[in-house]
């Protein structure tokens, strides 16, 4: 049954986030986000994602909503087969999470056009953010898959405070930061209030789009 996270849970801390990345085959004529946008005028250009309702699917829908571009989306069941088809030239572009695609990017089997994070991914320093693309509508565009720590709504405040302090301390450990970075994830410790505010922003951004498009997770 549906639930309201505001009444069912208490946010403790944001943990980490991983951005999306737009990738194309190495020989693709698409070099920039502007090139990609130019192909989104009539809705015929195909873009792969890793499944209906996934963050990658939502990411490309948000890009279209922000810019007015339209694409034909091919919903795979996971990234693996989409990667193979992209590398083989069966699909001309894919939106995926950086951590899923980076091996193929580093191996030269696919080329990254832009990432959806607020700043460039350290492992891909030459790949611009979508905000840097100069494309109208993407000036402030960011969208990432993220995880946070939550507790039941009735957890006593003093325990909530202890859990937050422990998480913030853990995520400040250089070894933990490095481990997440090795997985192309950025550690993002926060206060409970900051995590709640982030969820609120995401909900206002994503839920109307999901309802408008009738997206249902499969």
Language-model features: where?
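Ligand-binding "clamshell"
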Residues: 1-10, 69-70, 104-115, 122-135, ...
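Short helix-initiation/N-cap motifs at beta->coil->alpha
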Residues: 18, 74-84, 88, 97-100, ...
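Short beta-strand and adjacent tight-turn residues that come in two discontinuous sequence segments
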Residues: 50, 76, 95-96, 115, ...
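Alpha-to-beta junction loops
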Residues: 43-45, 67-69, 87-96, 109-112, ...
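Hydrophobic residues within well-ordered alpha-helices
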Residues: 40, 60, 86-87, 105-108
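An extracytoplasmic/periplasmic, membrane-proximal ligand-sensing/linker region
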Residues: 106, 157-218
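Beta->alpha turn/N-cap motifs
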Residues: 79, 96-101, 115-118, 173-174
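Hinge/capping helix and adjacent helix->loop/strand transition within the periplasmic-binding protein
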Residues: 1-81, 130-132, 146-179
């Amino acid at each position: 049954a549906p639930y309201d996270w505001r009444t069912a849970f208490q946010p403790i801390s944001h943990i980490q986030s991983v951005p999306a990345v737009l990738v194309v085959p190495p020989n693709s004529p698409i070099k920039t986000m502007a090139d990609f946008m130019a192909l989104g005028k009539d809705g015929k250009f195909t873009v792969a994602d890793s499944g209906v309702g996934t963050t990658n699917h939502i990411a490309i829908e948000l890009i279209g909503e922000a810019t007015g571009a339209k694409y034909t989306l091919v919903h795979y069941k996971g990234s693996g087969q989409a990667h193979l088809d992209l590398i083989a030239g069966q699909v001309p572009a894919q939106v995926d999470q950086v951590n899923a695609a980076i091996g193929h990017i580093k191996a030269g089997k696919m080329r990254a056009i832009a990432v959806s994070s607020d700043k460039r991914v350290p492992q891909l320093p030459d790949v611009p953010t979508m905000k840097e693309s100069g494309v109208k509508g993407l000036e402030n565009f960011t969208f990432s898959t993220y995880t946070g720590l939550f507790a039941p709504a009735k957890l006593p405040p003093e325990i909530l405070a202890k859990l937050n302090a422990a998480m913030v301390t853990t995520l400040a450990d250089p070894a933990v930061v490095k481990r997440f970075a090795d997985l192309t994830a950025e550690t993002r410790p926060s206060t409970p209030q900051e995590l709640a505010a982030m969820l609120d922003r995401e909900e206002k951004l994503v839920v109307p789009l999901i309802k408008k498009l009738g997206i249902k997770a499969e």
